Amino acid sequence: MHDKEVTNMDAQAIGKNLKELRQKAGLSREEVSAALGVGLSALAMYERGERIPRDEIKIRIARLYEKSVDEIFYTHECT
């Protein structure tokens, strides 16, 4: 989606956003991982900022939370 490299600080902010979005939506980790088609461990790594989702998963996340990919992964101000 974007060519710029994600720094550790960006990854931490993205992880925080993902966790806050899930909590605001009232969804469990199990529900989100099932909706995205990823394992619980992958979701946990996304939320801790240890791993950035592939573009395909970013799109699924954006659809799940009704946000744009840019809002969630590039502005860090979606929540």
Locate each region found by the language model.
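Short, charged recognition helix plus adjacent turn
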Residues: 1-9, 63, 71-79
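Residues in the recognition helix of alpha-helical DNA-binding motifs
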Residues: 35, 46, 75
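Short basic helix-loop element that most often maps to the first helix and adjoining turn
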Residues: 16-35, 60
